[in-house]
């Protein structure tokens, strides 16, 4: 799957991923009204609004982008209907030939990680039949439990030709409480980065490993160090736009070939119509605002890489 991601990034010229992280406050009133009219002000109604919101954004942007990243918590909050909306979103994005990064941040003891990996990246056998539960192409993984929590995911990736993005240095302000702690004079995130490179060497695609890393845009100097530690790992870069990251801050996350990183923007794209720069589109044309935000993001990052 890493080969497909790289191929689509080259084809679109867009090293970006749209984070499908819907909150009800992002969804235009006309979509909410229609969903509530059909299902009431219920979990089912909220999930229907989320699904229709996602569908419009995907319809307006899929030809510009290589991938989407639905954050599962935004669906879990609506219970079973929300999870059904998550699955519908994944399936619809697949129908548009998008790469799907399941932002699930899983990680547990071996048997539990194996179940998580099966659910999100693999297949499950039920009697004589086999099913694909969610069917994402990549999953985000928390490595805090160590190798026996990560290896089950790697095993499924090898079997299914899927991929991982392992949390290394996250974009949130308090990430340094643990990730920056020194061990033998070196920050923990560097040691995790070395482990990602080691895991990644086991399963290489044509140019890059199936095993990538999450490194926040808000820490560009750390990203520069980690790029050198993990030269064959794709880096998923959250924190662009709404969290403060800009194209010029991101150049060190990329290799000299202009590849090696994919930058995420969530509310900066899906709620673009709420921003002053895109207010002219209005709530009725929120999908067009999202498309314009994608085009601006591509131009920003491409311009920064060209000037590197």
Regions found by a protein language model. Name each.
Residues 217-264, 268-275:
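A C-terminal functional module that forms or caps the active site or interfaces directly
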Residues 58-64, 92-95, 154-159, 227-230, ...:
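Acidic (Asp/Glu)-rich catalytic clusters
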Residues 65, 134-137, 158-164, 207, ...:
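Glycine-enriched alpha-helix->loop->beta-strand junction motifs that scaffold or abut catalytic
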Residues 1-60, 279-281:
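N-terminal glycine-rich anion-binding loop in soluble enzyme alpha/beta folds
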Residues 250-256, 271-308:
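C-terminal helical cap(s) of enzyme catalytic domains, especially alpha/beta-barrels
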Residues 18, 68, 103, 139, ...:
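Conserved, mostly hydrophobic/aromatic
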Residues 45-46, 69-82:
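Glycine-rich, proline-tolerant flexible connector loops at the mouths of alpha/beta enzymes
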Residues 108-211:
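Conserved anion-binding
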